Amino acid sequence: MRANVLKRKLTLRIKRKKRIRAKISGCENFPRISVFKSNRTLYIQAIDDVKAVTLAAVDGRKLGVKANKEGAKKIAAEFAKTLKAKKIEQAVFDRNGYVYHGVIAVLAESLRENGIRL
């Protein structure tokens, strides 16, 4: 039964993800910031959907941080530095089907604190 529950949760997250992606997209000056959360770490990237190119990315494994709130703050600070170096000040936040709570909310708030308008 446990496998069915996990499969259902993943199916529901993917449905939410598709609903969100149908409504938002990014461009070169206003990219989409996509977040992926695994059990161990976080991945965040800025995507230009018009050209289908990743403009900037930060991997939590390379920073040596975990997928918790403190790690989210560190990843957001590093990602904000990367975006500012590329002269990107505003973006669209794509939570990728995850609930805007906990780590995802801290990540978005930390990006805002570091000067990125979402």
Swiss-Prot record:
Keywords: Ribonucleoprotein, Ribosomal protein, RNA-binding, rRNA-binding. Signal peptide: none annotated. One of its GO terms (cellular component) is cytosolic large ribosomal subunit. One of its GO terms (biological process) is translation. The keyword rRNA-binding applies. InterPro entries: Ribosomal_uL18_bac-type (IPR004389), Ribosomal_uL18_bac/euk (IPR005484). GO terms for molecular function: 5S rRNA binding; structural constituent of ribosome. The keyword Transmembrane does not apply. Part of the 50S ribosomal subunit; part of the 5S rRNA/L5/L18/L25 subcomplex. Contacts the 5S and 23S rRNAs. Belongs to the universal ribosomal protein uL18 family. This is one of the proteins that bind and probably mediate the attachment of the 5S RNA into the large ribosomal subunit, where it forms part of the central protuberance. This is Large ribosomal subunit protein uL18. The lineage of its organism: Bacteria, Pseudomonadati, Campylobacterota, Epsilonproteobacteria, Campylobacterales.
